[in-house]
């Protein structure tokens, strides 16, 4: 079930094109630097909306869903088939990659994107429970993005500005659509 906030956002004044939606996300990110802006394109914005829609349908609060999706954009553009240094959207490696492969086989009918987001939710309730608890206490998309990066992803190179900037863009787009 879609959260009412997200459902209202998606129903109100839907943009005429993905290009317009992308421009809205970028323009609404007042503190975005050029590095943050390079992550946004029409396909990623569309995928971001799909991810937020899916996560909120799984009872994830919208601001936390935005933080998670902002990290997925920064990690590899929400690409489900990425294999830079790991597997999938969040570049799982080692035991986490093996666990994902095992779980993926048990989710028939779900899209690959949904399977990967489902695995994130599974990890936040089990092996990454500490990250899940910390994330549940986030109050803004930016805070959720920071917590998810530090406690769940644990990347080699911290890039707070990029991930928090993307979360701000998603939050501002939602606020703009609700006010219209």
Residues of each region from the PLM?
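Active-site or metal-binding loop neighborhoods of secreted/extracellular toxin and effector enzymes
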Residues: 142-180
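Export/targeting segments at the very N-terminus of extracytoplasmic proteins
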Residues: 8, 12-70
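Residue-level detector of well-ordered alpha-helical segments, enriched
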Residues: 64-68, 88, 116, 143-144
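Metal- and O2-centered redox machinery and metal/ROS homeostasis
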Residues: 56-57, 72, 112-113, 180
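Short, functionally critical alpha-helical segments immediately adjacent to catalytic or ligand/cofactor-binding
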Residues: 63-78, 149
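Solvent-exposed, polar/charged alpha-helical surfaces in well-ordered, non-transmembrane soluble domains
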Residues: 49, 53, 69, 118, ...
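Peptidoglycan-targeting cell-wall enzymes and recognition modules
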Residues: 29-50, 73-138
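The structured alpha-helical core of multi-pass membrane proteins
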Residues: 5-13, 122-124, 171-174
